[in-house]
């Protein structure tokens, strides 16, 4: 299984668009994860159209248009492995222990603020 992992893209505030190499990885992946802070709903639309499977959540910089379409936490089981995607806006100190307490039922945890 090929996985592409994205987070904190902040399009168009930090860049106008994703680089071609990222789009190549997205299109080659079986599953694409995005851990929030999209900023633009246009990126969600394009990523959704170009991904085989998109698993995503909203981040703290995402407005109402993205929050209405994305969950705060996304869970999926692939090949028997449980994945969770969350942006997680708590303090960096103690994040791993906090996430282990809050989400004990996952095998792979994808967190934003990358």
Residue ranges and their predicted role:
Residues 3-34, 38-114:
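Conserved catalytic scaffold of divalent metal-dependent phosphoesterases
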């Amino acid at each position: 299984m090929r996985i592409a992992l994205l987070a904190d893209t902040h399009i168009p505030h930090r860049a106008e668009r994703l680089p071609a190499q990222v789009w190549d990885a997205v299109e080659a992946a079986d599953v694409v994860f995005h851990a929030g802070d999209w900023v633009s709903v246009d990126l969600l639309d394009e990523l959704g159209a170009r991904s085989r499977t998109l698993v995503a959540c909203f981040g703290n910089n995402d407005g109402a248009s993205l929050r209405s379409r994305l969950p705060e936490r996304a869970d999926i089981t692939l090949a028997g492995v449980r994945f969770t995607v969350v942006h997680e806006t708590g303090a960096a100190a103690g994040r791993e222990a906090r996430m282990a307490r809050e989400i004990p039922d996952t095998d792979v945890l994808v967190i934003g603020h990358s």
